[in-house]
């Protein structure tokens, strides 16, 4: 303790400039005051004794009268008072000087030192957090997290019952849950918000959307807005998306087709930066630039731009885009789904169906991957792996999903739930039914698709809701689904419940053969765009889904994503 006191006194006796400041400790000040008071008391006692002795001597030896004696005593008392006042004044001046010194130090010196020390600590932490190996430790100090009990829905733990078997119930009918929506929008009447992408991580979520200031053409200059936030519970105990930080990327960069990942306390988005329209891109060799954006909860952002020569491609591509839907984080890498056109087509037999179809063969299916409207390029899906994503310059590697495992390449998303990776791809070709399955990301890439007969999407006349026979077409809409059971047989989705038109958005809970429970958002005439998202969570085992739909604001002729929420109608069937 004495050693600590010595260090402390030594520390506070030094000003920020390094000069010595003479500050007495509390103990030293108390000792000095006690010493002065002792001296004063002793002096008064000595004077009193001396006065009495002098008076006695004077009276005895000289026989002074009583009057003269009184005058002498009075003179001595006055002298004593003068000495007392002088000593008191001296002590008071010393104490006041010390008090002023202490007050100055408390009001000025100490705060300056504390501020300096605080800055030193902050700089030390920031410097440490810039080191890759300490990134996760530093991120964990930021106190932003989903509400207690909230986590991404994991099918293996959700699709079970304490007693009996789980199933989707048709009764009661699902309804929309109350709560606010804080999705980014436009500040202009003619502005158009497109291509929403949502990733729900263990701690935070990331949401991205594209804002075109005039009209909805994909090639128009646009802002990209990336939000990070957490999921809370409102007063009705329903989950809400609460944005914490948002960043708007330069309109002149024209980011398009962005996919997001939320992991740790950061959001990542991978975008294309096209300088030409889609058809022109497919007709030329090489891909448009890609950009990886990083945003953290402090609002700090970093971007990495990659040209064709800087991307490790397993085959030459004429066009390549992130798939709009979210990606995943796994084993030190970010993995995004992508799609694009190969410069030279791959050989092999793609997914096909010939039963019940006239004049159809495997060659029909193979040729259907080559889209005339896109310069006859073979359109495939790819895995875009961002390795060392915490480093100063992450590396991008692209691996093509074999055509033997896939349908026509298109937009889609990946979900890592438990130990499985689920894949959804938009039904852009002749295969109109929902395309969802389990993806093995090891080598070679394989997909175990779950056949769905009940769910489909609107398309053009040749490839409408009911089409199941192979032919060349490019149509459909992005209406992803979230797996509720491990085999992806039970899903939550938003479907445009129409044959050929993008109308009638309907929230559906379905198995492979039947639509079990559904809710029409408004009416069959409500127009939408081609992106609907469903992402689900649990709150202490209770399931909820967020649905984001691009609604056509008909009176303004613009598109705006809107957020809806439902409770999952899962029940447990009692054993007989």
UniProtKB/Swiss-Prot annotation:
Residues 59-140 are annotated as: Involved in interaction with F protein. Attaches the virus to sialic acid-containing cell receptors and thereby initiating infection. Binding of HN protein to the receptor induces a conformational change that allows the F protein to trigger virion/cell membranes fusion. The gene is HN. The C-terminus (head domain) is involved in binding the cellular receptor. Residues 1-24 are annotated as: Disordered. Residues 59-576 are virion surface. This is Hemagglutinin-neuraminidase. It comes from Sendai virus (strain Harris). Residues 10-14 are annotated as: Incorporation in virion. Disulfide bonds join 192-216, 258-271, 357-469, 463-473, 536-545. Belongs to the paramyxoviruses hemagglutinin-neuraminidase family. Its main location: virion.
């Amino acid at each position: 303790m004495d050693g600590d006191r010595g260090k402390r006194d030594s520390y506070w006796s030094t000003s920020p400039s390094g000069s010595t400041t003479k500050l007495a400790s509390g103990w030293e000040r108390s000792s000095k005051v006690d010493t002065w008071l002792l001296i004063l008391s002793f002096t008064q006692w000595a004077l009193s004794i001396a006065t009495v002795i002098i008076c006695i001597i004077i009276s005895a030896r000289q026989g002074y009268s009583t009057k003269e004696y009184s005058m002498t005593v009075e003179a001595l008392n006055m002298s004593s008072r003068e000495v007392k006042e002088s000593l008191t004044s001296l002590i008071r001046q010393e104490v006041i000087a010390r008090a002023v010194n202490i007050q100055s130090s408390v009001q000025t010196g100490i705060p300056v030192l504390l501020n300096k020390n605080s800055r030193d600590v902050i700089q030390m932490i920031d410097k440490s957090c810039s080191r890759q190996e300490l990134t996760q430790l530093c991120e964990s100090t930021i106190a932003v997290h989903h509400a207690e009990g909230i986590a991404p829905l994991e099918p293996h733990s959700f699709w079970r019952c304490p007693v009996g078997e789980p199933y989707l119930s048709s009764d009661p009918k699902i309804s929309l849950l109350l709560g606010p929506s804080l999705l980014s929008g436009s500040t202009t009447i003619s502005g158009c918000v497109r291509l929403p992408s949502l990733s729900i991580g263990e701690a935070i979520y990331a949401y991205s959307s594209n804002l075109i200031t005039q009209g909805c053409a994909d090639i128009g200059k646009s802002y990209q807005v990336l939000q990070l936030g957490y999921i809370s519970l409102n007063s009705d105990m329903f989950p809400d998306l609460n944005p914490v930080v948002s960043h708007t990327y330069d309109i002149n960069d024209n980011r398009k087709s962005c996919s997001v990942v939320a992991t740790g306390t950061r959001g990542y988005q991978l975008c294309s930066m096209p300088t030409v329209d889609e058809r022109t891109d497919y007709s030329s060799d090489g891909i448009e630039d890609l950009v990886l954006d990083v945003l953290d909860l402090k609002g700090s952002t970093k971007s990495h731009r990659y040209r064709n020569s800087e991307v490790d491609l397993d085959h030459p591509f004429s066009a390549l885009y992130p798939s709009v839907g979210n990606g995943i984080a796994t084993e030190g890498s970010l993995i995004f789904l992508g799609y694009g056109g190969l410069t030279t087509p791959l050989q092999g037999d793609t997914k096909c169906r010939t039963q019940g179809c006239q004049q159809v063969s495997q060659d029909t299916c193979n040729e259907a991957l080559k889209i005339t409207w896109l310069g006859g390029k073979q359109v495939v899906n790819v895995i875009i792996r961002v390795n060392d994503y915490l480093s100063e310059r992450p590396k991008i590697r692209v691996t093509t999903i074999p055509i033997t495992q896939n349908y026509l390449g298109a937009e889609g998303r990946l979900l890592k739930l438990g130990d499985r990776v689920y894949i959804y791809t938009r039904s852009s070709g002749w295969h109109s039914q929902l395309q969802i399955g389990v993806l093995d990301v090891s080598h070679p890439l394989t997909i175990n698709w779950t056949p769905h007969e009940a769910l489909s999407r609107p398309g053009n006349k040749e490839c409408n809701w009911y089409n199941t026979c192979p032919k060349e077409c490019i149509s459909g809409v992005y209406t992803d689904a979230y797996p509720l059971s491990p085999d992806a047989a039970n899903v939550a989705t938003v479907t445009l419940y129409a044959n050929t038109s993008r109308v009638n958005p309907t929230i559906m809970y379905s198995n492979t053969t039947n639509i079990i429970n559904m809710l029409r958002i408004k009416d069959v005439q409500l127009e939408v765009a081609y992106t609907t998202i469903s992402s689900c969570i649990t709150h202490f085992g209770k399931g909820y889904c967020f649905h984001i739909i691009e609604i056509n604001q008909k009176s303004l002729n613009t598109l705006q994503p809107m957020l809806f929420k439902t409770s999952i109608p899962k029940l447990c069937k009692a054993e007989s």
